[in-house]
Amino acid sequence: EEKLLIYISYDLQKFSSSAIEKMFSSATEAKNSGYKIIGLTASSTEERNSFIKNNNLFFEFYTCDETALKTVVRSNPGVIVLNRGTVKQKKHYNDFSDLNFN
């Protein structure tokens, strides 16, 4: 994938409302800049589907092992920006607004 934004949350129930707002805003900006957006979580299918529906998200979350997700990013949630498989940015949820999609 040329431009990929991955939100990582090993536990979707620990997503704060302010983090959700920051995620939605940065995801919208990324989408408008041509990025494919996905999420990775260790949460159950029911929790995932509920989270997507309740927050009007326009991208999917996929399942991954919790330990693997914690290895990738320690914050819950966190985000990684990839360009052709190369990590360009890795941020804590407090810094979602600092993401650069150029």
Question: What do the predicted segments below correspond to?
Answer:
Residues I37-A42, N54-N76:
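Short, internal strand/loop/helix patches
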Residues Y10, A42, R84:
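Cofactor-binding loop segments of dinucleotide-utilizing enzymes, especially the Rossmann-like FAD-
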Residues E1-K14:
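Short active-site neighborhood of thiol/selenol oxidoreductases, capturing the structured segment around
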Residues N94-N102:
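A short, polar/charged loop-to-alpha-helix boundary motif
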Residues P77-K91:
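A short, hydrophobic beta-strand/beta-hairpin element that forms part of a small beta-sheet core
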Residues L5-Y7, I37-G39, V81:
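Structural beta-sheet core signal
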Residues L12-S17, F58:
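Short, flexible loop segments at the rims of nucleotide/cofactor-binding pockets, characterized by
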Residues S17-F51:
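Structural microenvironment flanking redox-active thiols in thiol-disulfide oxidoreductases
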